[in-house]
């Protein structure tokens, strides 16, 4: 028998079943099948409320939300991860550093965020890691394909790299690619908005172009994440142009928001702007 709350709302059991149906429908789609179930379920719950229980509409809303936070950064066709792994493996086996760098760059072009950063990759990481003590452990949250840039970060070979995101196929690819590149690492699938903040200590945590996406899903989620991190240094960045290369006053909006939050928490920080990215290196 379904359990009802005291306010005459729909039966709890039927609500949960509706969420499951929406989640399962979205998960069967080719584009979003690899997304963490927690992410899809959370967005499905919100979509069902917004659509007043209309399940087909909730499926559309869930896919739209996934596009905004995930799908827009990837190509329309599924990334060719097996071929990219073969290219990286062949380049590593050939022993030519230039060939390895070229194969890694081709892989990084699959994701919009890393593709945008490629022209100034070394400059970007010189600014980041030149401002902090040399880390033994780096954590990269909502990482996309950013861990592939390890060779451009100027870090010691023995550095441990912890990477997480919501795409299980992407994380499997990174795990195998970082093995080939001989980077000490651990990868996991994590939905940051659900409160699954990694508990491990890291000397530096990267949260690159991520806070606006978390805040879009739930107000306060991004700042709660940063507060919960076990890192003395946190690198937060914001895009200053959209994927369509429009500025929309993004620098002013994000800089004002960040600096207000930093003042409230008593953080000290360095600021840099490189190409279309506003960077804050926070000491806590």
Swiss-Prot record:
Coiled coil: none
Pfam families linked: FmrO
Key word Methyltransferase present: yes
GO biological process, one term: response to antibiotic
Residue numbers binding S-adenosyl-L-methionine: 73, 111-113, 117, 142, 165, 191-192, 208, 217
Source superkingdom: Bacteria
Molecular function per GO: rRNA methyltransferase activity
Enzyme class: transferase
Keywords in alphabetical order: Antibiotic resistance, Methyltransferase, rRNA processing, S-adenosyl-L-methionine, Transferase
Reaction(s) catalysed (UniProt annotation): guanosine(1405) in 16S rRNA + S-adenosyl-L-methionine = N(7)-methylguanosine(1405) in 16S rRNA + S-adenosyl-L-homocysteine
Catalytic activity, EC: 2.1.1.179
Claim: rRNA processing is one of the keywords in the record: yes
Note: Protects Frankia sp., which is an antibiotic-producing bacterium, against self-intoxication.
Family stated for the protein in its record: Belongs to the methyltransferase superfamily. Aminoglycoside resistance family.
Purpose: Specifically methylates the N(7) position of guanine 1405 in 16S rRNA. Confers resistance to various aminoglycosides, including gentamicin and kanamycin.
Protein name in UniProt: 16S rRNA (guanine(1405)-N(7))-methyltransferase
Organism, as annotated: Frankia casuarinae (strain DSM 45818 / CECT 9043 / HFP020203 / CcI3)
This protein's encoding gene: Krm
